[in-house]
Amino acid sequence: MDLARRAAGGDRRAFAALYDRHLDAVYRYAFYRLHTDAEAEDVTGEVFHRALVAMPKYEPRRPFLAFLYGIARHVVADHLREQRPSASFEDAIAHASDAPGPEETAARLDDARRLRAAIARLTPIQQDIVIFRFLEERSTKEVAQLTGKPESTIRGIQMRALAALRAALGSEGER
């Protein structure tokens, strides 16, 4: 019996193994959406707490990571409604850098600001697909499994999201 089925049956050790296996993926998703370590850690903890409570409702035919991402989308949305992020996307990029020079830092921060603003104008599902496809580097098939949408729908949403990003970034660059 696989870990998710055992965890759904109340096996705490199986759930702990699932936690260890998927912690980083859930944290990265939360960080990409919220942009601060503290908020991502808080949301990640809440996701696993809700997952533990919801395990009796888990449907084993669906990938466990899709179950977690569904919970994560709701927890992130709740968090964003409750408060605004305290640190900016630019701060996150600056902390992730390898200490570039001031000119490069300024250019990266400006690019990050523009990209963050453009992504923020996308619909929530477009944001998720951009995160999963390009930041998490997941295949279209994996994104379809995670979102519960057909691959053709994922490709269409991705195409519209990228067109919107190109338009937004192109129009900002022309100002």
Where are these regions (language model features)?
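Short amphipathic alpha-helical boundary/capping segments
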Residues: 2-6, 114-122
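Short, charged helix-capping/linker segments at alpha-helix termini
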Residues: 6-17, 27-46, 146, 151, ...
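Residues within the DNA-recognition helix of helix-turn-helix
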Residues: 22, 157-162
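Short, Lys/Arg-enriched C-terminal cap helix and immediately downstream tail that follows
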Residues: 81, 122, 127, 162-175
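A short pre-motif secondary-structure segment
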Residues: 129-133
